[in-house]
Amino acid sequence: VVQKFQEVIGLSVVMGGISFVVSMIIAVPLGILAATKQYSRADYVITAVALVGISLPSFFFATLLKLLFSVKLAWFDLYGLVGRDYAQLSSWGQFCDRANHLVLPIVTLVIVSDYIRTARAKGLSEHVVIYKHAFRNTLIPLVTIIGGSLPGLFSGALITETLFSIPGIGYISYQSMVAGDIPFTMFYLSFMAVLTLVSNLLTDIMYAVVDPRVRIS
């Protein structure tokens, strides 16, 4: 069970890490823009996009992306981690082939990511106040979202990995459940439970770091 887990966890962590970084790069600047342009057209557009992103399920976006970029435009393969000629490619070619197959799954994770919710941050209109004071006050909900998403970062995206046949921990766990592999299923669920407890602990610690008012004296 442990060996099987070690073989697939790395890919899920890479996908989750990339989607985390991309989501933060997108969400935080958009949140600041919405705060500095409160009730403007930009604010309403950002709010609408954020609401759509968190309201529609991941399989809906995954299906749309596959239909557009795989079926219509033929830019990416429909599923899998490598192409048919993977073995004949150079080391750099194999890297690019894997990266190409991870584009759509990662885009799906970014679109439905909880971090996009931070784009709805509100604040005062003055830029200096926003960047130096108000932004610090938005760190509490930001820490909550990041901490709550830690299990998903390391446990894989079961639906996304299954739809794109990416052999990460989520996909392998789903296959194990379908096949009745009880030992691996129990290991995966226990792993998720431990991650949830650790994420809650880290979230509480970070609360005290970003906001001294919640510290226990």
What does each model-identified segment do?
Residues 1-3:
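Short membrane-interfacial helix/loop motifs at transmembrane-helix boundaries
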Residues 9-42, 58, 85-217:
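Alpha-helical transmembrane segments of integral membrane proteins
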Residues 45:
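Conserved active-site segment immediately N-terminal to the catalytic lysine
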Residues 48-80, 101, 108:
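Membrane-water interface segments at the C-terminal ends of transmembrane alpha-helices
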